[in-house]
């Protein structure tokens, strides 16, 4: 692995670990599982390959999705009627809901979800 590729892989790994810390800081079992999964994937792809750059980009994209789009919810254990409390941190992407404001217009789907 070239020096620049190794540095990029380390940077992506650190970004992924930081993102798991931000998103799962109140949920230790999930935090540990997410970090183990990241470690296993990086160890599995330790040797340089043709798609190493793609794998590094994938790790960076996963870190960004975790950091900007994943919100954890929790409620008191044993109380199924309790309200959910969401852990919305500063880096969560917030939408403006413009599509909801349009109202009463037919939504056209141009292709199937699986394609």
Swiss-Prot record:
Keyword vocabulary terms for this entry: Chaperone, Mitochondrion, Transit peptide
Chief location category: mitochondrion
Residues annotated as transit peptide in the record: 1-23
Gene Ontology CC terms: mitochondrial matrix
A GO term for molecular function: protein folding chaperone
Transit peptide listed as a keyword: yes
Protein name, entry field: Mitochondrial zinc maintenance protein 1, mitochondrial
UniProt lineage: Eukaryota, Fungi, Dikarya, Ascomycota, Pezizomycotina
